[in-house]
Amino acid sequence: MNVIHINFKMKSREYSKLFGCNIYGFIRVTSMAQKIIDTSEFQRLRNMKQLGLCYLVFPAATHTRLEHSIGVYDRTRKVIERIYRQYPDREYYIPELSDKPIKLDAKIIECIKIAGLCHDIGHGPFSHVFDDVLLTDIDHPNKHHEIRSCLITEIICKRELSNELNDKHIDFIKSIINPTSSHKGAIYQIVSNNLNGIDVDKFDYLARDSKNLNIGSEFNASRLINEFIIDKNNNIAYPKQCCFDIDEMYNSRYCMHKKVYSHKTVKLLEMMLKDIFTLIDPIFKISETINDMDQFCKLTDNSIFELISTTINPRPFIKINIEPDQFMAIKKANTIYQNILSRKLYKQITEINENNGGKALCEKFIEYITNKHPNIKNSLYLFKTVRGFIGGNKNPFGQIYFYDKMEDDNSFTMPECHFAGLINKGTQEVTWHIYCKDSKILDLARFEVKNFFNTLE
């Protein structure tokens, strides 16, 4: 693997360790990065599966947040060192560091790489499931993993890198992890690109997820990484020929959501986990750990199930004080957990695309069936899945900049007609699902679905 060695006079940037990677070969990290990797907060990511509950449907989906984070570190290194090599005298506006535009130096580059390394360190158990499913009813700024990543990164940097980084550097790292709308320009488009979603985080997880699950993907980020420029407006721009590579990237994301991330069985498992969480959170206060990063960093994918198992089957040397009603709630949670292990899962009885009535039609069906069978309502689950090019509902295509290799001084956007695939369908696909929790009424529910749709004809 070729490594760009920039002649920086900074001892802390000496390469210190080599990691094997099934995507990029070998990855070298600096001594500053190694100090972060060797913390308990970062090592916790070994016990955090990248794809949450997907491993219960796809046995190979066991790769972790740790390997993804190191992969993003390497892709960040490749991009930022290429920027330095191509534009050694260019100045950038970095408000956390200076009121005036400044040139890149060794420490700034190291900060950007650290941001890539730590961008996911704030994930909770089962990754996105923790925020998007388990904490949906919680109103707190720390419910978002990007915010927690910033908080944990600050804790680590102040503890482990106090001799290398000051408060301004730490604030800069946090702004790269979670940029706001005021953070403009190429520097803030590397790790987490709010402009159009083209960033090294996406490059790595698409490559890593498809590789580990053996799902073919036509997207390869190499051309985008090796051919971009920074235009006169300080945005990253790509050769106009790369519009097809970018289209493949967006389509790969959509396909991974369709095939894996939003697979119907994955989603019903998430609903079962939510029911478990609803039962035990009032007892164990798991959601309250987002107020205390020291406590939060003790959580892993195993935490929720271990709390249940330890309470139901306590070891002789562990004393647990649980009220009778609390114990009954934990027993109910354990029943759901055992059903997951024995594949006695919730079942989907119907799904309706938003364009065909979506939520309104699903709610109408629930009203229809509960009028006929009042006791069935608590056994039905209404759930929405969203699949698309990027997170959110904004169209990214008008924010992607291209250049002509014969005239690279000026960048431009391309009309949407230049992009193929899902662009003709819009940037998001919303589907509403109804799940049945009780296997005893499954046949009845499916029978009533047929009756309901017959009444609409």
UniProtKB/Swiss-Prot annotation:
Name its GO BP terms in alphabetical order: dGTP catabolic process
Q: Which InterPro entries match?
A: dGTPase-like, HD/PDEase_dom, HD_domain
| Domain HD stretches | 65-206
**Which domain of life does the protein's organism represent?**
Viruses
Q: PROSITE patterns per the record?
A: HD (PS51831)
The UniProt GO MF terms for this protein read: dGTPase activity
Residues in a coiled coil are: none
What Pfam families does the annotation carry?
HD (PF01966)
Q: What is this protein called?
A: Putative HD domain-containing protein L394
Species in which this protein is naturally found: Acanthamoeba polyphaga mimivirus (APMV)
